[in-house]
Design a protein with these regions (language model features):
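Residue-level detector of beta-strand structural context in well-folded domains
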Residues: 1-3, 52
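Acidic (E/D-rich), amphipathic helical modules within compact regulatory domains
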Residues: 3, 12-13, 19-20, 26-32
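Short, structured motif recognition centered on aromatic/hydrophobic residues
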Residues: 3-5, 10-14, 61-65
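A hydrophobic alpha-helical transmembrane-helix feature that marks the membrane cores
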Residues: 9, 13, 54, 107-109
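Short, surface-exposed beta-strand-loop junctions and turns on beta-sheet-rich folds
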Residues: 18-21, 69-71
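A low-complexity, Ser/Thr/Gly/Pro-enriched, surface-exposed linker/loop concept
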Residues: 26-47
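Mid-chain, well-packed structural core segment of small domains
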Residues: 50-87
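C-terminal charged interaction modules
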Residues: 80-123
């Protein structure tokens, strides 16, 4: 799972096997290690109700998706989910959860064997 943060925007991109695991288990998680005892954990979790939202607690980013959005996203060609979450200080956090597609140009060192086929490959 890829995590991209830019300003007040948070994006998760999931490979095919990660989408399958999320559909089956209701969660996927990954982390980035910064050294001994220091890591950033990020997770995508299915919840029964609510809205697409994110929390940050104790170095763990959790993005939650209600089943009514998660199920069709996992089981169809739907590319992504998007929401804006108020931060409580007059700002918003933009959330994106997307299926990870292969790049149109091959990049060295990039393993895309588990990525979704790019729909623009057939232009």
């Amino acid at each position: 799972m890829k995590l991209r943060i830019r300003g007040n925007s948070l994006r998760l991109r999931l490979s095919r096997s990660e989408v399958e695991a999320f559909d089956r288990d209701g969660r996927v998680e990954d982390s980035a290690r910064f050294g001994p005892g220091a890591r950033l954990v990020y997770a995508l979790e299915r919840v029964t109700a609510g809205a697409l939202s994110a929390t940050l607690r104790d170095g763990r980013v959790a993005v939650t998706v209600p089943s009514e959005l998660a199920d069709p996203w996992c089981r169809t060609d739907q590319v992504g989910l998007e929401a804006e979450q108020p931060t409580g200080d007059g700002e918003t956090l933009r959330l994106l959860v997307e299926k990870d597609f292969t790049c149109l140009k091959t990049r060295s060192g990039e393993d895309e064997s588990d990525a979704f086929p790019n729909p623009h490959d057939h232009c």
